[in-house]
């Protein structure tokens, strides 16, 4: 049985978030949560909450043993980019890009 959770339009760079996501892909749920707890990256806290939400979804679906869950798939897609301008010298302006991410996680039971 599979359960999933999604997090949309998070104000994190997809490139930086993928570094953290790669740490937990394919691991058991407890190992993944412990890895994220000690990660210094800002995205680790949000991914940890997302994993906890996916575990709660699995319990609601009727998962018999939560300890058998593992991270089957987890991926980060780029979202909309917020564009801002900052004033520069001689009447010019420079673009500031503020990227967003969509994070999706799917948990499954080990057989």
From Swiss-Prot:
GO MF entry, a single one: rRNA binding
Q: Which UniProt keywords apply?
A: Ribonucleoprotein, Ribosomal protein, RNA-binding, rRNA-binding
One GO cellular component term of this record is: cytosolic large ribosomal subunit
* Highest taxon in the source lineage: Bacteria
Entries under Pfam families matching the protein:
Ribosomal_L22
User: Which InterPro entries does the entry link to?
Assistant: Ribosomal_uL22 (IPR001063), Ribosomal_uL22_bac/chlpt-type (IPR005727), Ribosomal_uL22_bac/org-type (IPR047867), Ribosomal_uL22_CS (IPR018260), Ribosomal_uL22_sf (IPR036394)
Q: Which GO terms describe its biological process?
A: translation
Q: Ubl conjugation: is it a keyword of this entry?
A: no
Subunit info here reads: Part of the 50S ribosomal subunit.
What does this chain do? Answer: This protein binds specifically to 23S rRNA; its binding is stimulated by other ribosomal proteins, e.g. L4, L17, and L20. It is important during the early stages of 50S assembly. It makes multiple contacts with different domains of the 23S rRNA in the assembled 50S subunit and ribosome. The globular domain of the protein is located near the polypeptide exit tunnel on the outside of the subunit, while an extended beta-hairpin is found that lines the wall of the exit tunnel in the center of the 70S ribosome.
Give the similarity note. Belongs to the universal ribosomal protein uL22 family.
| Designated name of the protein | Large ribosomal subunit protein uL22
